[in-house]
C-alpha cells in the first residue's frame, strides 16, 4: 500500500468516525429528550412463564394510569408508550369494557420472551402519527348481511337476516384462511362479486389465489365456536343473528356484540347475546355468551367446533381444550385447524358428540360463559397438527398465568 492510499484510508476512517460520533450524539439527545418528557412512573411488564409470548395484549385500567402518571381523562388521547430497551413505540388503544361507555382500559400490544421483562415509559404527544390498525371488521350488507372480522393471521364471518330470508339458516362461525398479514375481507367480497357477475368460478374466494380462501364448511353446524342449548344428545341453536353493535374497531382489539332472536330450546324460550373480541396476532376470539330465559334452574349450554369427515380430534382428559385438525372443502387447501379453550373457572367439560367437539357448561339465566375459539391454517403459520395442539396448550397456560404489571419509578 503506497503513501497516497494510506492518506485516503485515514481520511475515510476519520469520516466514518465523525459519522458514528454524530449518530451517537443524535441518539443520546433523543434518549435524553424522551426520558425528560416521560411521565411520573414507568410500567414493568414481566412474563412469569418459561414460554415466549408473541403479540399479546395487556389490559391496564385507566384508573391506574391516572393514579401513577398524574394525568387527567382529557389527556388519555395523547398518551403514547415507549419500550425503554428499544426506544420503539408500543402499539396502544383506549378501550371500553362496557358498550357505549367511556374508555376504562389502556391496551398495550407487546412481546415477551420466556421469563422476560419489559419496562415502558409514557409520554403525552399530540403530534404522534396515527397507528396503523392490525384488526378490521365490518357489516357486509352487499352480501346478504354478513358480518366479517380479521387480524393479521385469520378471518371470520357470521350470517345475518338477509341470508336467512333466502332459507339459509346458520348461526355458526365461518373461517377464512389466509397466509398474508394484509386484510382480506374487502378483497374476498370483491372476488365473490366478480365471480358472480362474470359466472367465472376462478374468481371465487373459494379458490386459493395465493392469498388464501374460504374452504370451511359451516352449514348448520356451530362452525368455529358457535353455541347452543345442549339436551344431552343434540344441540338446539338459534337462527341467524338479528343485530350487531361494533364496540371497538382497533387498532389492536376488534370487539362487537351479537344479538339473536328468542327460540324454543328443550321446552324453554331462550335468547342469547355474544360479545366477541379478536386481538392483534391471536388466532382465537374471546367469546362471552350470555343466555337469558325464564325460571331459576340452570340449563346446559355448549360451545361447539364442527368435526368434518376425516378430521382428527384431540381432547386432553384433564384440560378444557379441544383441538380439531379439520378437512377443508377443497382437498388441495391443506388442513384447517380449529379449536377452543376454556379456563378452569368456567367449570366446562370438553367432549365429542353430534359431529362436534363441545365445551359444555351449566348456567342460570344471565350468567356469562367465557371461552376462546379460533382457527389456523396448515398452509400459513400452523403447518402441523402438533403445532396447533401446542398453540392451544400454550394459549391456556398464558391465560392462566397472565403478564405481571407493576409500576416503578
Please provide the spans of the model-predicted regions.
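Solvent-exposed N-terminal domain segments of exported/luminal and surface proteins
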Residues: 126-232
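Bacterial N-terminal signal peptides that target proteins for export
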Residues: 3-25
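Alpha-mannosidase-like glycoside hydrolase catalytic domains involved in N-glycan trimming
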Residues: 41-137
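Acidic (Asp/Glu-rich), glycine- and aromatic
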Residues: 272-274, 278, 283-316
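Polysaccharide-binding surfaces and accessory modules of carbohydrate-active proteins
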Residues: 44, 48, 67-75, 299-353
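Beta-strand-rich recognition/accessory modules
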Residues: 104-112, 340-409
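Extended, loop-rich substrate-binding clefts of extracytoplasmic carbohydrate-active enzymes
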Residues: 197-279
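Bacterial N-terminal signal peptides
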Residues: 23-35
Amino acid at each position: 500500500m503506497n503513501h497516497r492510499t494510506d492518506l485516503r484510508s485515514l481520511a475515510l476512517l476519520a469520516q466514518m468516525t465523525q459519522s458514528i460520533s454524530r449518530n451517537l450524539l443524535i441518539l443520546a439527545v433523543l434518549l435524553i429528550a424522551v426520558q425528560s418528557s416521560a411521565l411520573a412512573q414507568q410500567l414493568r411488564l414481566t412474563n412469569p412463564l418459561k414460554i415466549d409470548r408473541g403479540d399479546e395484549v395487556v389490559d391496564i385500567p385507566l384508573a391506574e394510569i391516572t393514579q401513577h402518571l398524574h394525568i387527567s381523562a382529557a389527556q388519555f388521547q395523547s398518551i403514547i408508550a415507549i419500550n425503554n430497551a428499544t426506544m420503539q413505540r408500543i402499539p396502544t388503544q383506549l378501550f371500553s369494557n362496557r358498550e357505549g361507555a367511556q374508555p376504562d382500559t389502556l391496551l398495550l400490544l407487546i412481546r415477551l420472551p420466556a421469563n422476560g421483562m419489559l419496562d415502558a415509559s409514557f409520554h403525552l404527544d399530540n403530534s404522534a402519527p396515527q397507528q396503523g390498525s392490525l384488526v378490521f371488521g365490518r357489516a357486509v350488507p352487499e352480501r346478504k348481511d354478513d358480518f366479517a372480522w380479521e387480524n393479521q393471521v385469520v378471518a371470520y364471518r357470521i350470517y345475518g337476516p338477509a341470508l336467512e330470508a333466502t332459507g339459509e339458516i346458520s348461526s355458526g362461525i365461518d373461517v377464512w384462511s389466509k397466509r398474508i398479514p394484509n386484510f382480506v375481507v374487502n378483497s374476498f367480497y370483491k372476488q365473490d362479486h366478480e365471480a358472480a357477475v362474470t359466472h367465472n368460478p376462478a374468481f371465487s374466494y373459494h379458490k386459493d389465489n395465493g392469498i388464501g380462501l374460504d374452504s370451511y364448511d359451516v352449514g348448520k353446524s356451530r362452525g368455529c365456536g358457535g353455541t347452543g342449548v345442549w339436551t344431552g344428545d343434540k344441540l338446539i341453536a338459534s337462527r341467524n343473528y338479528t343485530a350487531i353493535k361494533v364496540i371497538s374497531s382497533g387498532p389492536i382489539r376488534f370487539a362487537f356484540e351479537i344479538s339473536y332472536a328468542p327460540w324454543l330450546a328443550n321446552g324453554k324460550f331462550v335468547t342469547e347475546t355474544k360479545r366477541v373480541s379478536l386481538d392483534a396476532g391471536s388466532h382465537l376470539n374471546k367469546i362471552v355468551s350470555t343466555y337469558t330465559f325464564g325460571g331459576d334452574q340452570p340449563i346446559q349450554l355448549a360451545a361447539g367446533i364442527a368435526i368434518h369427515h376425516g378430521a382428527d380430534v384431540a381432547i386432553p382428559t384433564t384440560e378444557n381444550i379441544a383441538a380439531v385438525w379439520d378437512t377443508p372443502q377443497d382437498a388441495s387447501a391443506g388442513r384447517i385447524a380449529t379449536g377452543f379453550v376454556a379456563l378452569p373457572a368456567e367449570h366446562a367439560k370438553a367432549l365429542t358428540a353430534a359431529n362436534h367437539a363441545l365445551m359444555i357448561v351449566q348456567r342460570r339465566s344471565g350468567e356469562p360463559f367465557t371461552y376462546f375459539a379460533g382457527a389456523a391454517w396448515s398452509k400459513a403459520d400452523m403447518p402441523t397438527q402438533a403445532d396447533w395442539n401446542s398453540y392451544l396448550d400454550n394459549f391456556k397456560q398464558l391465560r392462566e398465568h397472565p403478564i405481571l404489571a407493576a409500576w416503578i419509578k
